[in-house]
Amino acid sequence: MNVLSTNLQDVKIIEMAVYGDHRGFFTESYTKEKFADAGITIDFIQDNHSLSVEPGVLRGMHFQRTPKAQTKIVRAVTGVIYDVLVDMRIGSPTYGKWEGYILSEHNHRQLLVPKGFAHGFVTLTPNC
């Protein structure tokens, strides 16, 4: 597992090991111990999946205020998405700043979206 920092405070790109062969691939999407070893401790309360059949579908911006705020892990199981995050945390050094990230079935990257961030994505390919 590789955890990359970004220009937004507390946002991380997570790269899990991917094991592939002629049948496809296997990867862990979440392992509590590995995440904790990387300094990421999350108490997940919900797991969601979405499918957008057409390219160009925009989902978001999603934002929850305390006490409903959630840390999220976002990934694209199929296709390619462009995910945008905006730091909405008043007092944060990166408050009001945003960045976008490509997540795809090819790069297997996951995006750690901390509480207090708005996030949304647009599908760049069909069936995302």
Walk through the language-model features, giving the residues of each.
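Non-catalytic, conserved peripheral segments adjacent to functional cores
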Residues: 1-109, 125-127
